[in-house]
Amino acid sequence: DSLDRIVGENVQFIWQTGKFYDEDAKKVMAEKKPGNVVQTAFVSNMDEAYRAADLVVSRAGASSISELQLLGKASILVPSPNVAEDHQTKNALALVNRQAAMMVSDKDAPQKLIETVLTLLSDSDKLKTISDNVKGMALNNAVEKIVDRVFEIIERKK
């Protein structure tokens, strides 16, 4: 069991379960009482959670990836298999292929995710490389760049 594996590790976890899994997670937490895990249905101050995190485990939606890039957060991405055209796997691979994230498939997550987390957290060089690489992929000032491009197109059409 993954929770049994992390109890006693010198790592703090914030576990956002979502509303659907909240009650089941609360039962597991009450039974196991892991002192190094904070479970919540929803993280209302995500900026604080990101700031505290050395590593983020996340789905691979475009918004999540953009946040990770802008903040330069190392991540292990677990693409959702329940999305159109498997686009989350494509999103994740765009980072993985640039050594800007690691990926664990949804079906492999129960067996491999916690070990991948602990292995990466114990390798500060790899953690820094991933963080630096993902930060380098960030599109800073995206709105300004889009607006500038729109104005360029308008000027050409005059």
Language model segments and positions:
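Acidic donor-binding loop of glycosyltransferase active sites
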Residues: 51-64, 73
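Donor-nucleotide binding loops and adjacent catalytic segments primarily
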Residues: 1-55, 88-92, 97, 104-113
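Short glycine-/small-residue-rich Rossmann-like dinucleotide-binding loops
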Residues: 18, 61, 79
